[in-house]
Design a protein with these regions (language model features):
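Charge-rich, low-complexity N-terminal segments
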Residues: 1-135
Length: 135
């Protein structure tokens, strides 16, 4: 079976804060996030696609224009009265978002019935700062 590595870049806007950080990132603030993802696997024998790029974008875009907070953050309850909040098990750093998105994309591969997985993902929170998860 042939193995192919595909790449997709997706951007989204979202706010977050780091509950356990001492410094300005403890305040609620927003970013123009960029996600770069590499997925490796065997293409579907019928359509020759590893995973549809639109499916990758859809998984990442669930964060677009959202507020992302640590599930232990006391701000969650106050903000949820006005706007939905995506919560994470820990502070929503670029490092943690890389793991969450990679896991979500791996689940999407399984859901699509393709033998593929994320091998590398970068989550950029600014033009000069990113976290890269390599598996």
């Amino acid at each position: 079976m042939m193995t192919v590595r595909i790449y997709k870049e997706v951007e989204f806007d979202a706010s977050h804060r780091l509950l356990h950080y001492v410094g300005k990132c403890h305040n609620l603030h927003g970013h123009r996030w960029k996600v770069e993802v590499w997925i490796e696997g065997g293409p579907d024998p019928v359509n020759c696609i590893v995973l549809d790029y639109a499916r990758i974008k859809q998984v990442v875009q669930r964060f677009d224009h959202q507020i992302v907070l640590n599930e232990a953050d006391p701000m969650v309850a106050a903000i949820e009265a006005f706007h939905p909040v995506i919560t994470t098990e820990g502070d929503p750093t670029s490092e943690l978002l890389a793991k969450i998105i990679a896991d979500d994309l791996d689940a999407e591969c399984r859901s699509a019935g393709v033998a593929a997985r994320v091998t590398s993902i970068r989550v950029w929170e600014s033009p000069n700062a990113c976290a890269e998860l390599v598996r």
